[in-house]
């Protein structure tokens, strides 16, 4: 519960213990470039995907969870494939900022669950517990400077456009109930122009560019090693004050001591 994490943080603060901010990693790239697959591969190589959600040191967030609620008129367009889901205005940036700030403060947060078939938010939430590393993926993660500046590492998944289109066609037909003609029209009308205008220009902000997505194990292994340094040896260095400006160690509950390191 959110109240539990807030009480825990308050108790630690009153006892003079500093709380380290989580390490936020932004993962951007075009539609169906493999952003989710890269994040999942990182989780797998770290062994975090087999750990209970309450105990994970690394968690994944998706910008897709933060699509705005559509008006009846917008929803009617969406059903026909005539609504631009790749425009910055399609996302609830205010909620993204609030969520990121809460995560930075070590709070438990509740993430909306979006239904791509009905184009609406479900009446349920995903609970995200405090973690040491947060991977936040989405097509426009680096578009807003306010959001972009919160990431301590920025990754851009760079995949061939033809590969991305073929993946999107297969995904939208099999998972989202779309017709082929609708998927192609939407890609030509909205997706491709939006990528070129809003997503591709943000590639310059990336610290690491990952060609071929999850197939690029060399790049992913380097990123995994960096995250392992944060989870393992990094803690020892930060115990002494971590004077380089990245914060101090997040204090763990007794129940957290069993987490693998």
UniProtKB/Swiss-Prot annotation:
Pfam families: PRK (PF00485). GO terms for biological process: CTP salvage; UMP salvage. Substrate binds at residues 86, 114, 119, 168, 178, 186. Residues 238-261 are annotated as: Disordered. ATP binds at residues 29-37, 215. The keyword Cell membrane does not apply. One of its GO terms (molecular function) is uridine kinase activity. One of its GO terms (cellular component) is cytoplasm. It catalyses: uridine + ATP = UMP + ADP + H(+); cytidine + ATP = CMP + ADP + H(+). Keywords: ATP-binding, Kinase, Nucleotide-binding, Transferase. Its EC number is 2.7.1.48. Pathway: Pyrimidine metabolism; CTP biosynthesis via salvage pathway; CTP from cytidine: step 1/3; Pyrimidine metabolism; UMP biosynthesis via salvage pathway; UMP from uridine: step 1/1. It is an enzyme of class 2 (transferase). Homotetramer. Belongs to the uridine kinase family. Phosphorylates uridine and cytidine to uridine monophosphate and cytidine monophosphate. Does not phosphorylate deoxyribonucleosides or purine ribonucleosides. Can use ATP or GTP as a phosphate donor. PANTHER family: URIDINE KINASE. This is Uridine-cytidine kinase 2-B. The gene is uck2b.
